[in-house]
């Protein structure tokens, strides 16, 4: 006798008809496992996020020592623009610019071996002396606001003040998970 799997019977009656619906969804897994480099390397990834439907899911896996903060900002904007559910995952190292991306997801998952480094931006300026001074003054104000917004409720106010003064904040997966409980934010910041 042949053992065939039977489909579950859906109860029906005159008052309630149950119609099974098949919903097609896509799941995209993106692995950011090396330096976050210049934005043009991420255009396909950002296009996937921006064109994904509300039923789709995008998982951003981070095992990364950081990189260009401007590129991280562009990725964060793509997360904000996405209709899909964005889950960011600490798969290993989540340092520097990667930590900014992590905190922008709709949901965050942390592996038992994950680590995180939060620090203030690094950068450089070039040009005529007065132009350099203007850029440095602008960067001070701009990045101070940006980092306060990203790390709000994840880091304490004192940690953010010290971070802006140059102190690094390191944490393991247990500490990351504990702090994530404090965050209530709109999608993508």
Residue spans for each PLM region:
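N-terminal organellar transit peptides
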Residues: 1-189
């Amino acid at each position: 006798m042949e053992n065939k799997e039977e489909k579950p019977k859906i109860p029906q009656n005159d008052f309630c008809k149950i119609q099974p619906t098949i919903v097609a969804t896509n799941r995209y897994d993106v692995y950011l496992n090396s330096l976050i480099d210049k934005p043009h390397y991420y255009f396909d990834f950002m296009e996937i996020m921006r064109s994904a439907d509300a039923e789709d899911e995008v998982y951003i896996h981070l095992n990364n020592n950081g990189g260009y903060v401007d590129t991280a900002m562009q990725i964060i904007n793509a997360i904000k623009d996405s209709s899909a559910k964005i889950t960011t995952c600490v798969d290993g190292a989540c340092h520097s610019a990667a930590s900014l991306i992590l905190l922008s997801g709709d949901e965050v998952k942390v592996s038992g071996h994950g680590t995180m480094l939060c620090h203030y931006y690094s950068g450089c300026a070039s040009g005529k002396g007065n132009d350099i001074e203007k850029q440095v003054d602008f960067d001070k104000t701009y990045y101070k606001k940006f980092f306060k917004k990203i790390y709000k409720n994840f880091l304490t106010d004192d940690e953010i003040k010290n971070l802006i003064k140059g102190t690094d904040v390191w944490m393991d997966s247990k500490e990351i998970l504990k702090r994530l409980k404090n965050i209530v934010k709109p999608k993508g910041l």
